[in-house]
Swiss-Prot record:
GO terms of molecular function: cysteine-type aminopeptidase activity; initiator methionyl aminopeptidase activity
Function statement: Actin maturation protease that specifically mediates the cleavage of immature acetylated N-terminal actin, thereby contributing to actin maturation.
Annotated keywords: Aminopeptidase, Hydrolase, Protease
The protein's name: Actin maturation protease
């Protein structure tokens, strides 16, 4: 697949500052590093894939038609830095999320690490992308031929979505906005298309239906004070998260990464 060309957009207008409202907290159910099960044994040579499929109840007893991914080290976010952590994971940890945070603050994209603009994260991605790679801001549904073909060709995605209590995609009108890095895909025997994801609130590889992630991405329309940060102020792009500089129906496509795609094999 050829590199994606991109055209620099005009500089965005100054962002808005929003003030805090009400607190809340969530926790992910802890899961051991190793699992002993007769489920998903087709992926036993790929422990992170086996665990991800086991936890998501995907291809429990029957191998998928196809599965491929990049092995990416997880990084747990500190503060509301999910987008910066996702980008740092994509870049192999260099620059670090802390370095990206300093850059984002200098560019006036964020106050505390939050990124409620796909455009802002796209600008950071393009700035720090390694030589042979390219990126593009995608506008529209994720569940489309363009996105599927990019993943099949070894591309990755940076995707905003609403995260449920277990961090899986949900529909909350944007009130639980979060960022994930899509590192691969899986097609089951019923031809359902899944994505393999990393994000800053879990060390486990996540496995989500692409159509569910797409619906979550499409519903990002309203800001709500991020849970766990009741006293912090956050920057919103002009027009809010549902506007043209926001998160709604937007993601970042990346290809040409200098990484080896892992094709999951089974006997």
């Amino acid at each position: 697949m050829s590199n994606i060309s991109s055209v620099a957009p005009p500089p965005p207008p100054p962002p808005m500052i929003v003030t805090p409202s009400t607190p809340a907290t969530t926790k992910e159910r802890p899961v051991g590093d190793n699992i002993t099960t007769d489920e998903c044994t087709w992926a036993c040579e790929y422990p992170e894939v086996q665990k991800g499929c086991y936890l998501s109840r995907v291809c429990q007893y029957t191998p998928p038609k196809h599965c491929q991914y990049y092995s990416v080290n997880s990084i747990v976010q500190v503060g509301p830095t999910c987008g910066l952590v996702a980008l740092s994971m994509l870049l192999g940890g260099s620059p670090t999320a802390d370095d990206l945070l300093k850059d984002a603050i200098d560019q006036e994209y964020t106050l505390n690490g939050e990124l409620f603009s796909a455009q802002y994260l796209f600008e950071l991605t393009r700035k720090h992308m390694p030589g042979p790679a390219a990126c593009q801001l995608h506008v529209g549904p994720l569940d489309c031929k363009k996105v599927k073909e990019l993943l099949k060709a070894g591309g990755c995605l940076l995707v905003p979505y609403d995260a449920d209590v277990n961090h899986a995609p949900c529909v909350k009108n944007g009130h639980r906005a979060h960022w994930a890095l899509i590192v691969g895909y899986l097609v089951d025997t019923q031809d359902r298309f899944y994505v393999l994801a990393r994000h800053g609130k879990s060390r486990n590889l996540a496995v989500w239906p692409l159509d569910t992630l797409s619906q979550s991405n499409e519903n990002l329309k309203e800001f709500a004070q991020p849970k766990g940060y009741p006293d912090d102020e956050f920057l919103l792009p002009p027009g809010g998260i549902g506007g043209s500089l926001g998160l709604n129906e937007r993601c970042i496509l990346v290809n040409g990464l200098p990484k080896q795609v892992i094709h999951v094999r089974w006997s």
